[in-house]
């Protein structure tokens, strides 16, 4: 495991000591949680390490970690990094690599560990060579550009000049403003039309790495002949030093030495001198002075980099642009390409990894207490990320034609593959399996539905029920499903294996008691109803899943379920069924619509939201009935239930959460409890109340709220017995209600959240996230656009409209690109992709595919048919596509898939009509389909030559969907921490979130998107509690992590840059703060364009900092732009606009332009007066400032008159033009970034402070009575009560 969340020091996370009681986390109260936190805190200790040839040094370790982790630290340290083959000894005993430190006898504070060099084996020698190669390449970004080995890019250090922690000390002189160059580049100024691409990946000065060797490669004399093996030769290396010396090196069991071989003569005898060294680096230091100098300098640089810049990410991130990287000779990479990996991971003695066994064994680990759960989750997560990487490599090998099919005689589309113990199949409808469901379209969507099912069952995590490791890879237009292999499944026919479910969509169905028992446990969390279907012999068969879900017992005796594509109920808005009428809300909006396949399912988030909505309604109804009974109005009950169900259908989000009658609700809770206790004697009336409420909301039970769906309803070919007809009718109604719920509740909810800016999408990815969180599928895009267009003030949703349209265009283009690519063979890929991009984005009217390659293809076509060309099209058909034709297809795809009419015939019309920009569309399409293009400036608008040439297409990457295993305990701590923060207990919140961070690190390693959220919130809390340097350190990690895991221009990364800029400013690092803001100001228009609501906040930040460094004209450009954007999205009378006016007024005042300043402050004052009233603090402040400005203006006028009258003899009073103090700038920055709670008046604050202090004194008194420590607690108390007043400030942040 690599470095944890420390800055290069070996700070390992505290891991959990076993808890006293082994209860599940879920059963714990909050007190329980806090109890647990205290137990987990774990003290590290210091040990000394003795290494041959290096002075003894100390490192910090934790009792929880393994010996192996000390190995890892030594391989990372500057002075010991070149050693790999050693053991650690304590008092002469060799330590087991996998032993936990706490289990080692006599291992304690001050122990001395000895590093002892061990003899090499072939495997150890390979590991050593690979490690040295990694050290030589440690600053080289090519692996990140090529998307290899979980490397990814980060550019933060370019804008901070290295690590912020250290440079903070150097840059403390932030007040000497003369040294700061504040001029932003032209292209980031408001209103600039220029969108350059090159600055996206600035050249890092470390990237011209110091070259240590010219060539370092395996020798052609490998492997050693038998007699040399018996002398201990393991392998031979060939090196050319920078001094042009050619040397041949033997790796032997004792180490490395020079031999006498040349390129053409084999002479394995040691050279004279042979310099036998245990490490390759020590040998090369002797041979080459340049190597010695440069290697040392390189390692110094490597360890100075922030660990987060170099730690591998759990899943590979691909970059859509890259500069021209020189292709250097690299022996390890060359060997990797031609052999199965022999590195750390892949090489388990004698075999490739048995993925299925690993995936299932990790699930079987015990989970009684926290340490066990952490260990289990860490193992699950690690194996999943390894499996995903292997599956991705395999899928690419399959499509590139490098894997032999297991059924080679069949047609290409029908072939299946096994590679590295993973089974691969292609997303085509083979053997008409999906004929009734939409053929190839259904076969294409089925793997993702299946993956969603696997996700859901994995999350429920029932003991004894197993799913397959599943990864879905889209690559070069093909969809490949990769699955782990059930032991024994390949030896028998599917018909014999399946003991539960159906292999023919419900004609023959079987069931099995053990499967029913296991699936029953998942049915409540997944809301699946147990139901009965008829098989082909009209026998009743009981199921607890959809019929397609198959149960197979493997040869390992485990119960597997597979084909989970119908885990969630069908979406009736896209499944017209004869003879069924949909609710009026659906028909009014034009549903149901015919879709290209019949596998449209509701998302799990939608099912959960729908059930939650029904539960609120159930409580409301029951409470209402109870109140009525109390008033003895029994006769109203009948009509009430019916109006309730009517009300239910039309319930919009506005009515959804009315305050329930608390009295009634309390009674209902009581009623539920008494019913459970005395089933017989319960008052029949109370039963009736619950029964009525249950019936009205569609609960499957009559005594409690329980809503479940039957996933087989509306499945063609599935029949139900007669006695369950009523139940089936109820289920149909429930599905119709759920379909209506998407349209009447969830889509309006999304729009409302966009309006009040609680969700602010900036690109396709963030839009999809927002829709998916609310359970809205992307096929509803057209409907969402309709709703947005009909909004009363459409301009307030401009940003959403623009992203929606861009998403419809790029997704339609993606669908077309997929089939387009299937007809292209490997040698023509670059030409075909550049031709497609030209047709899609270039203004060049007659884009013709590049002729040379076109001729090549047609001449060679006959020979090349053996390449995996799964499309039925002619290999050169792609070359005939024209821009007109492509855009016509995009428009028809948008209509048929999203039911949206695009009003454009070519790219330039689309840009004009919908106010889009080509660079953003280019980014979207590249990310969606995995294209990587050359980093350079593209001229999209030239009418004389096409935008892209085939040299511009650098690579095509896979787009991978996989399961994301969760760190559940850590997540609970994180949520409790957020809750505490929102209640205003910052200190307690901070402790819980720190604990969550430890646990996240434990499970995920150092890099993960959830750790990123954790660090962001911690930084915010540090900042609010006044610890600016800690805030800076945590936020720096958050930025690095966001760049590495989500992408350098992902909207979240842009946000992280803005937070970091604020903390830099607070730490007096003004120029760094500006650099970071300028970076964000470059990225946002690239991703979205000008005029996004978030741009107002960004421009206000930039304007304020520029004001602080006295760049008044520049400052005004940004602040006035922010004012315009705020007025557009929040309305001209909003408080945000008032604040914008005030900020602009302040700058005009410092410029001495009092008339403009007065005008803006008056506008602000009017808003405050109308919104908050005359007595509000804000209104009064504004009024005071107006008076001051008026006085200044009068003074100025008087001076001017004096000058006019008396000319140069005038006796003038000097005017006060004061530059703003940094403190006042920081105050304003805090306000606009939501760090202070604006609308609270002074009186409110005092009330709040008194209340907080009263509560804390109460708490302290209780604690004091228990601990007799009242005295020591007092100072701490007053501190926290102060910080609690700012609590409101974190609420908006923590919600994300």
Swiss-Prot record:
Subcellular location: Cytoplasm; Cytoplasmic granule
Bias type Basic and acidic residues, positions: 8-26, 1263-1276
UniProt cross-references to InterPro entries, sorted A to Z: CLU-central, CLU_dom, CLU_N, CLU_prot, GSKIP_dom_sf, TPR-like_helical_dom_sf
Keywords for the protein's UniProt record, in alphabetical order: Coiled coil, Cytoplasm, Repeat, TPR repeat
Swiss-Prot/TrEMBL TPR repeat ranges: 970-1003, 1012-1045, 1096-1129, 1138-1171
Main location: cytoplasm
PROSITE patterns, A to Z: CLU
Disulfide feature: none
Record-level Gene Ontology MF annotations: mRNA binding
GO BP: intracellular distribution of mitochondria; mitochondrion organization
Residue ranges of coiled coil: 662-689, 1242-1274
One GO term describing the cellular component: cytoplasm
Positions with biased composition (Polar residues): 1278-1296
SUPFAM superfamilies recorded: Hypothetical protein c14orf129, hspc210, TPR-like
Keyword Coiled coil recorded: yes
Residue ranges constituting the Clu domain according to the UniProt record: 333-575
Xref: Pfam families: CLU, CLU_N, eIF3_p135, TPR_12
Chain's role: mRNA-binding protein involved in proper cytoplasmic distribution of mitochondria. Specifically binds mRNAs of nuclear-encoded mitochondrial proteins in the cytoplasm and regulates transport or translation of these transcripts close to mitochondria, playing a role in mitochondrial biogenesis.
UniProt-listed HAMAP family: CLU
Homology family: Belongs to the CLU family.
Protein name: Clustered mitochondria protein homolog
Organism annotation: Xenopus tropicalis (Western clawed frog)
């Amino acid at each position: 495991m690599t470095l944890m969340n420390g800055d290069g020091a070996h700070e390992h996370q505290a891991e959990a000591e076993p808890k006293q009681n082994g209860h599940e986390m879920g059963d714990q109260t909050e007190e329980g949680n806090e109890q647990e936190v205290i137990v987990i805190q774990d003290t590290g200790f210091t040990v000394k390490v003795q290494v041959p040839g290096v002075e003894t040094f100390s490192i910090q370790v934790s009792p929880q970690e393994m010996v192996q982790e000390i190995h890892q630290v030594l391989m990372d340290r500057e002075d010991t990094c070149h050693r790999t083959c050693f053991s650690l000894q304590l008092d002469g005993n060799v330590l087991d690599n996998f032993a936990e430190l706490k289990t080692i006898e006599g291992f304690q504070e001050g122990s001395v560990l000895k590093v002892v060099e061990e003899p090499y084996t072939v495997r150890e020698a390979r590991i050593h060579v690979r490690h040295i190669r990694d050290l030589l390449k440690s600053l080289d970004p090519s692996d990140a550009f090529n998307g290899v080995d979980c490397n990814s890019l980060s550019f933060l250090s370019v804008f901070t000049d290295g690590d912020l922690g250290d440079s903070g000390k150097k840059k403390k002189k932030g007040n000497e403003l003369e040294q700061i160059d504040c001029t932003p580049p032209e292209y980031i100024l408001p209103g600039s039309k220029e969108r350059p691409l090159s600055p996206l990946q600035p050249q890092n000065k470390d990237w011209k790495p110091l070259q240590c060797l010219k060539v370092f490669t395996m020798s052609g004399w490998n492997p050693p002949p038998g007699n040399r093996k018996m002398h201990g030769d393991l392998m031979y290396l060939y090196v050319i030093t920078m001094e042009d010396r050619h040397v041949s090196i033997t790796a032997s069991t004792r180490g490395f030495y020079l031999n006498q071989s040349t390129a053409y003569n084999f002479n394995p005898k040691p050279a004279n001198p042979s310099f036998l060294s245990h490490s390759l680096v020590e040998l090369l230091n002797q041979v080459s002075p340049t190597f010695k100098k440069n290697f040392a300098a390189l390692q110094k640089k490597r360890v100075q980099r922030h660990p987060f810049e170099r730690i591998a990410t759990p899943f590979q991130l691909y970059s859509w642009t890259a500069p021209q990287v020189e292709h250097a000779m690299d022996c390890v990479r060359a060997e990797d390409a031609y052999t199965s990996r022999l590195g750390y991971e892949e090489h388990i003695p004698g075999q490739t990894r048995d993925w299925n066994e690993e995936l299932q064994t990790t699930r079987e680990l015990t989970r009684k207490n926290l340490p066990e759960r952490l260990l289990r989750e860490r193992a699950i997560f690690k194996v999943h990320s390894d499996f995903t990487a292997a599956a991705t490599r395999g899928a690419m090998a399959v499509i590139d034609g490098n894997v032999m099919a297991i059924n080679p005689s069949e047609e290409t589309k029908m072939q299946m593959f096994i590679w590295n113990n993973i089974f691969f199949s292609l997303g085509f409808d083979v053997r008409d399996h999906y004929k009734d469901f939409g053929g190839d379209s259904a076969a294409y969507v089925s793997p993702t539905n299946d993956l969603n099912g696997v996700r859901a069952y994995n999350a429920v995590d029932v003991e004894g029920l197993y799913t397959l490791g599943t990864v879905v890879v889209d690559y070069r237009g093909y969809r490949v499903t990769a699955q782990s292999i059930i032991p024994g499944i390949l030896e028998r026919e599917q018909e014999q294996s399946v003991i539960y479910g159906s292999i023919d969509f419900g004609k023959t169905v079987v069931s099995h008691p053990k499967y029913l028992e296991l699936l029953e446990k998942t049915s409540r969390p997944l809301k699946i109803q147990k139901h009965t279907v008829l098989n082909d012999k009209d026998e009743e068969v009981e199921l607890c899943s959809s019929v397609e879900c198959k149960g197979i017992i493997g040869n390992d005796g485990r119960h597997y379920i597979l084909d989970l594509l119908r885990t969630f109920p069908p979406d009736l808005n896209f499944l017209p069924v004869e003879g069924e009428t949909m609710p009026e809300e659906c028909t009014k909006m034009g549903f149901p619509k015919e879709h290209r396949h019949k596998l449209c399912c509701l998302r799990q988030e939608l099912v959960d939201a729908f059930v939650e909505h029904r539960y609120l309604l159930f409580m409301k109804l029951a409470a209402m009935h109870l109140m009525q009974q109390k008033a003895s109005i029994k006769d109203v009950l009948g009509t009430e239930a019916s109006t309730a169900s009517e009300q239910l259908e039309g319930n919009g989000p506005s009515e959804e959460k009315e305050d329930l009658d608390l009295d009634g609700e309390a009674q209902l809770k009581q009623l539920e409890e008494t019913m459970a206790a005395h089933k017989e004697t319960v008052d029949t009336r109370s039963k009736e109340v619950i029964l009525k409420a249950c019936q009205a909301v569609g609960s499957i039970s009559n005594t409690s709220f329980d809503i479940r769906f039957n996933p087989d309803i509306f499945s063609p070919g599935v029949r139900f017995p007669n006695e369950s007809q009523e139940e089936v009718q109820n289920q149909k109604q429930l599905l119709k209600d759920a379909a209506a719920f998407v349209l009447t509740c969830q889509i309006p909810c999304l729009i409302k959240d966009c309006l009040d800016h609680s969700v602010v999408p900036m690109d396709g990815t963030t839009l999809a996230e927002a829709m998916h969180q609310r359970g809205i599928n992307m096929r509803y895009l057209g409907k969402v656009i309709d709703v947005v267009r009909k909004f009363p003030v459409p301009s307030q949703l401009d940003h959403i409209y623009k992203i929606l349209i861009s998403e419809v265009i790029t997704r339609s283009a993606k669908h077309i690109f997929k089939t387009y690519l299937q007809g292209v063979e490997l040698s023509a890929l670059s030409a075909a992709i550049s031709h497609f991009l030209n047709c899609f984005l270039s203004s060049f009217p007659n884009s013709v595919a590049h002729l040379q390659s076109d001729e090549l293809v047609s001449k060679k076509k006959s020979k090349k048919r053996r390449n995996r060309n799964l499309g039925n099209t002619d290999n050169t058909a792609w070359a005939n596509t024209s821009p007109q034709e492509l855009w016509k297809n995009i428009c028809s795809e948008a209509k048929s898939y999203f039911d949206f009419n695009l009003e454009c015939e070519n790219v330039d019309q689309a840009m004009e009509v919908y106010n889009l920009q080509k660079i953003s569309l280019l980014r979207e399409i590249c990310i969606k389909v995995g294209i990587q293009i050359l980093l350079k400036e593209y001229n999209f608008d030239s009418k004389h030559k096409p935008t892209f040439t085939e040299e511009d297409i650098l690579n095509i990457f896979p787009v991978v969907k996989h399961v994301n295993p969760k760190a559940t305990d850590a997540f609970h701590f994180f949520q409790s921490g957020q809750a505490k923060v929102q209640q205003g207990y910052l200190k307690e919140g901070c402790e819980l979130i720190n604990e969550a961070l430890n646990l996240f690190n434990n499970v995920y390693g150092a890099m993960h998107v959830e750790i990123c959220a954790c660090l962001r919130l911690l930084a915010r809390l540090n900042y609010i509690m006044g610890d600016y340097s800690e805030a800076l350190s945590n936020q720096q990690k958050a930025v690095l992590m966001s760049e590495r895991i989500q992408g350098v221009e992902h909207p979240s990364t842009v946000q992280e840059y803005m937070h970091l800029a604020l903390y830099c400013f607070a730490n007096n690092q003004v120029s760094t703060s500006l650099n970071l803001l300028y970076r964000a100001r470059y990225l946002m228009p690239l991703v979205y364009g000008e005029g996004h609501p978030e741009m107002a906040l960004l421009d206000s930040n930039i304007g304020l900092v520029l004001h602080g460094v006295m760049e008044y004209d520049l400052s005004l450009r940004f602040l006035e732009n922010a004012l315009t954007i705020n007025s557009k999205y929040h309305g001209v009378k909003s408080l945000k606009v008032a604040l914008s006016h005030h900020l602009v007024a302040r700058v005009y005042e410092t410029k001495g332009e009092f008339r403009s300043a007065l005008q803006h402050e008056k506008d602000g004052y009017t808003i405050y007066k109308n919104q908050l009233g005359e007595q509000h603090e804000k209104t009064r402040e504004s009024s005071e400032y107006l008076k001051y400005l008026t006085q200044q203006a009068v003074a100025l006028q008087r001076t001017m008159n004096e000058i006019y009258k008396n000319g140069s003899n005038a006796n003038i009073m000097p005017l006060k033009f004061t530059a703003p103090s940094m403190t006042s700038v920081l105050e304003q920055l805090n306000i606009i970034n939501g760090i202070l709670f604006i609308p609270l008046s002074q009186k409110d604050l005092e009330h709040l402070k008194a209340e907080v202090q009263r509560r804390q004194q109460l708490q302290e008194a209780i604690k004091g009575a228990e601990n007799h420590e009242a005295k020591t607690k007092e100072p701490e108390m007053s501190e926290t009560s102060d910080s609690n007043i700012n609590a409101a400030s974190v609420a908006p942040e923590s919600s994300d």
